[in-house]
């Protein structure tokens, strides 16, 4: 069967992930476990700058930074109200910031094994993504080390799935795994689903525990997140040029009487425009062109998003991550 199996705990149970990382010999950054809103309040009052992450239940809380208590207090008041009787038992993982750049592996994992062709890239948080195809042996050392050390756990847990990592690398060159995605995350799945041309073969073989090698359709991919405030609570009608349908990925997509819509999912992000190319510049240019070609009510995107990802590429080189 295709899917993450029990390996989903590595993404959902962040406290368990820390334990697995330690056992696997991966570095673990300074962090605290806070059980209940009151324990979290007391810790955040004296610890500005830390990052707060939810545990187990996606949607209860999105990761946020505790800039200072004055700013954070209303958020916790609201969270306590929404959690109701669970507010005293909900667990939070609170992490100290780690200096460096965040890079990730994006591809598949079949019982702890990885295809010989891979993609890695940089995300502009909630705005865009840049990815590059390489031979697995040419992946940055930090990404290969994380995969190698997690592989036994993923094999034991039955992972046959899409798989991505967010790994922070800084001056000490150590690979700090921040979060794995044991699924087709967003981004970068909108991009890599087209960057490789034979996912049907990979999924079919992977479901049987066999490895079909990924076949690249291009050398680079770029992705730009599309959003609309209107789409939070309304069906968003989209005018997508027929020739670009392959490059516009819509969440909650439906077609009614020949027209394209994004169904309301309670969030402003409605999908992404992607671009492929034999050079990074070609991929970025194509993504921008495709994003500009789509029309929808209050539809917008960050035209500078990929500049941030490009800056991360240069910063990564300072820490031994060649692009």
Segments predicted by a language model, with ranges:
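Short, charged, surface-exposed secondary-structure boundary motifs
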Residues: 9-16, 127-129, 260-261
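Internal nucleotide-binding/catalytic subdomain
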Residues: 62-185
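Peripheral (often C-terminal) accessory segments that flank ATP-dependent C-N-forming ligase machineries
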Residues: 204-323
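A structural signal for short, well-ordered beta-strand elements
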Residues: 10, 33, 65, 69, ...
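Active-site "cap" helix and flanking loop/linker of ATP-utilizing ligase/carboxylase catalytic domains
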Residues: 142-164, 171, 181-245
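Conserved N-proximal alpha/beta basic substrate-recognition cap immediately N-terminal to
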Residues: 1-48, 57-58
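Residues at or immediately preceding the N-termini of alpha-helices
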Residues: 14, 37, 68-73, 279-281
């Amino acid at each position: 069967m295709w899917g993450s199996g029990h390996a989903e705990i590595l993404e959902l149970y962040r406290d368990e992930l820390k334990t697995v990382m330690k056992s696997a010999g991966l570095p673990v950054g300074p962090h605290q476990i806070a059980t209940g809103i009151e324990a979290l309040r007391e810790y955040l009052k004296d610890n500005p700058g830390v990052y707060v992450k939810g545990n187990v239940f996606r949607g209860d809380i999105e990761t946020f930074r505790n800039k200072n208590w004055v700013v954070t207090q209303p958020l916790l008041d609201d969270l306590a109200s929404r959690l109701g009787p669970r507010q005293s038992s909900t667990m939070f993982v609170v992490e100290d910031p780690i200096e460096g750049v965040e890079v990730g592996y994006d591809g598949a994992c079949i019982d702890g094994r990885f295809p010989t062709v891979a993609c890695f890239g940089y995300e502009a948080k909630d705005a865009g993504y840049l990815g590059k195809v390489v031979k697995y042996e040419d992946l940055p050392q930090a990404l290969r080390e994380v995969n190698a050390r997690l592989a036994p756990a993923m094999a034991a847990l039955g992972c046959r799935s899409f798989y991505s990592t967010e790994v922070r690398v800084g001056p000490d060159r150590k690979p700090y795994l921040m979060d794995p995605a044991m699924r087709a995350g967003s981004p970068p799945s909108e991009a890599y689903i087209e960057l490789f041309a034979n996912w049907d073969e990979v999924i079919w073989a992977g479901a049987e525990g066999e490895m079909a090698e990924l076949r690249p359709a291009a050398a680079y991919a770029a992705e730009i997140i599309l959003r609309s405030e209107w789409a939070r609570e309304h069906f968003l009608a989209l005018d997508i040029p027929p020739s670009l349908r392959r490059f516009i990925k819509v969440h909650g997509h439906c077609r009614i009487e020949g027209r394209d819509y994004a169904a309301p999912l309670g969030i402003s992000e409605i999908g992404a425009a992607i671009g492929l190319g034999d050079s990074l510049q070609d991929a970025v240019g194509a993504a921008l062109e495709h994003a500009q070609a789509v029309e929808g009510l209050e539809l917008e995107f960050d035209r500078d998003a990929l500049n941030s990802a490009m800056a991360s590429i240069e910063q990564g080189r300072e820490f031994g991550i060649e692009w």
